[in-house]
Amino acid sequence: MVEIAKEELTKISSLEKPFAFSVFFEDTHFPSGYVDEECEKKYPKQIHNVFANMSRRINNFVNWIKEQPFYKDSVIVILGDHLYMGDDLYDDKRYNSKRHAYNVFINTGKSCEYSKNRDFCTFDYFPTILDCLDIKYEEDGLGLGRSLLTGKPTLLEQLGRQKLEDSLSSKSNFYRYSLLNRR
């Protein structure tokens, strides 16, 4: 997959037009990840080998991008869509409560005072990515999302997890009666 991504990036970057490129890796997916012929088997558990291999591949891919002429005008966004769902990652289950998805923005050209350990949701990625690309938009955010670069509080920071979850899961009379036309 990485080699295909490199070929595609090389091809579209040669067009000398702005572009967006997305690649999705699923090697670390439940139940035990995918082991290919290049995966080193250093650890007793398959999932540990899979995570080590994917970490190495992504690191090599990012370093390759950094060496390319298009890197100076590029933003790299790495998002973990969710935590690993298996229960075989740690023998000591106490570590499960300390886990979080890995997310990083590389080469944004931006600085902000409050960028670490923010409380945010997936819908905050969209305005953050647009901010990284210097794309302007109205108001303090887009939809429910708030840019993590502005220092303005996200909805999760404003409301707290429980209140936000309750608000998002509540029924909407407008949606039900006006949009779905249900009585």
Regions found by a protein language model. Give the residues of each.
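Solvent-exposed soluble domains appended to multi-pass membrane proteins
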Residues: 1-183
